[in-house]
Amino acid sequence: MANPFSKGWKYLMQSLDTKIEENADPHVQIQQATEAARKQHQQISESAARVIGNRNQLEMKMNRLQQDAQKLSDNARTAIQQADKAAAAGDQTKANELNQTAELFASQLVTVEQELDETKQLYAGAEEAARQAQQQQQQSAARLEEQMSQINQLRSQAVSYTHLTLPTSVPV
């Protein structure tokens, strides 16, 4: 009766031999290097896109807040002017209502300006991060191009090597 440990050991050794042969094949190694280089570049590009997208979202938010602040400022100014006209005309009730409206616009303006200041600070950081991410992406693209050039050289060498090692005629 065969020893199960011996059979397992032989199976393991055969499996390892197969793996070594697969990995020793230059074509497999070249393919693995190609996939790894492309995957790394893809990850860097996706990360850069997220960082740049964040910056763009902050820029849009900042623009919207600036427009809101301008609108609230205009509304507060208009309410004050109308309150002054109402007071000059002797309508104190309407003047008080318009002054309260102006105060409401002013308090909203303060809130929007605070949010705008916070967004500007976030945007400054995001802009620097986007610049760095863009540089990293460009460096990654250059690295990928260089790696692909080296990989193409290896492929041509592997093809040459394969042609040299294969027998040209098989004895019969």
Show which residues each predicted segment covers.
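Charged, amphipathic alpha-helical oligomerization/scaffolding segments
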Residues: 11, 36, 43, 71, ...
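Short, charge-rich amphipathic alpha-helices with coiled-coil/heptad character
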Residues: 19-57, 121-122, 126
